[in-house]
Amino acid sequence: MAGQRVRTRFAPSPTGYLHVGGLRTALYNYLFAKRMNGEFVIRIEDTDQSRKVEDAEKNLISTLEWAGIIADESPMHGGNYGPYVQSQRLDIYKKYCQQLLDDKNAYYCFSTSEELEENRQLQLKQGLQPKYNRKWLPEDMGGSMPQSEIKKKLDEGVPYVVRMKVPDYVSVWFEDVIRGPIEFDSATIDDQVLMKSDGFPTYHFASVIDDHLMEFTHIIRGEEWLPSMPKHLLLYEFFGWEPPKFAHLPLLLNPDRSKLSKRQGDVAVEDYVRKGYSSEAIVNFVALLGWNEGEGSEQEVFSMDELIEKFSLERVGKAGAVFNVDKLSWLEKQYIKTRPVDVIVEGIKPVLNEALAQRSPEMSVEWITSDDYLAKVVDLMRERVNFEHEFVTFSSYFFFEPESYEEDAVAKRWRPDMPELLGEFSKLLEANDDFTAENIEAELKAFVAPKGLKPAVIIHPLRLVVSGVSFGPSLYHMLEVLGKETVLRRIARGIERISIPEA
């Protein structure tokens, strides 16, 4: 394997959504391969046909591509090592299974599910770790079952599975790239089923065969696969193959340090996409769940190119990584602040078009969906929003007439003489040919000074009639962005609609 081109893989099962842990596994495999000028592959492990979900394979790959994780080889992209779907490789597994049977490293097992459960319960009562009792281990492999009985069952067509024969009293050892040396005692290892009665291989068997034939140099996967390592290493030994290097990633934890699960929050990537998180923020966040650049670095915002340049397995920790949604939200905010205006404009158009389809705005649709207008809204609001969709939902007054006016603000700010004051100020604005924030501010201050009023007396009601709410960006800049025609119309509308609160 020395000198071989680095090849990594992400091998999900098409059983539903992409878990955030799966995204991290895919990302680390991708980053490592690209950092080493190698190849990243997607393989679909669908050997458990009972759990297969329609379109899950396509959705998994499209989610990865949305995140910027593009495979060099996959079921959709093809490649020199296909097929890349395990259910299309059954003849390959049968061939290697027969080799194990011929070499007496595997054997037929005809035990029924009832027998297996009875044996399991008996071992539990005895305080033993449940393991197969080797009832069908042949005499010539150290067992007690005559070959004649095995042949009889095969001739009768009795359903069977094929189990690996785990050697007795041996030590299975390997060097994990992240965790260092790890050793297992074969006495704790069950005779794993390799081929099921439906003719499909188990995960353990198929993954080892495929990882070897597809020439992967590094297997980067979750910590939960560590207990399977001795079975996999024994299979490599049975076939006389050199195993790849293994790196087992730390668990993802809830803030209370329990294992991340959907019982305590969202765990599917699509859940966070639906909430409005961008691919850049999600990838950045997931990259930091276990990896850090090293001592002395305070950088927390990384582009994909920067991650590829800086990533190394040596900087991945062993301890569980806490999934802190607040950190993800903070990262999203950083990307909103720095993302090019034209990119944000394109991002909010679908949200705006959906909102427009549900409402009939009084202003011209062409105007409020123009790139120039949207760019002005983005410039003014980017410091105040957390997600792209909030440019529309949080700032709807840039696109729609206020449907109501904040009651508390009306009660607090609306004086009996406010219709008269706003009407008078509206005439000054109408005569203003230079409708800029600076001029509007100067106009307002000049208007209130002779009346002995503070600017706030007009500022708050003016914001209210224009936006319907008592908060938002700089009033003067908001008025400039909305434009004179809209501002004058909304002042008149507000004067007509807002009633003087009763004492």
From Swiss-Prot:
Keywords: Aminoacyl-tRNA synthetase, ATP-binding, Cytoplasm, Ligase, Nucleotide-binding, Protein biosynthesis. A motif ('HIGH' region) lies at residues 12-22. It catalyses: tRNA(Glu) + L-glutamate + ATP = L-glutamyl-tRNA(Glu) + AMP + diphosphate. A motif ('KMSKS' region) lies at residues 259-263. ATP binds at K262. Its main location: cytoplasm. Its EC number is 6.1.1.17. GO terms for molecular function: ATP binding; glutamate-tRNA ligase activity; tRNA binding; zinc ion binding. It is found in: Cytoplasm. Pfam families: Anticodon_2, tRNA-synt_1c. One of its GO terms (cellular component) is cytoplasm. GO terms for biological process: glutamyl-tRNA aminoacylation. Catalyzes the attachment of glutamate to tRNA(Glu) in a two-step reaction: glutamate is first activated by ATP to form Glu-AMP and then transferred to the acceptor end of tRNA(Glu). Monomer. Belongs to the class-I aminoacyl-tRNA synthetase family. Glutamate--tRNA ligase type 1 subfamily. This is Glutamate--tRNA ligase. It comes from Chlorobaculum parvum (strain DSM 263 / NCIMB 8327) (Chlorobium vibrioforme subsp. thiosulfatophilum).
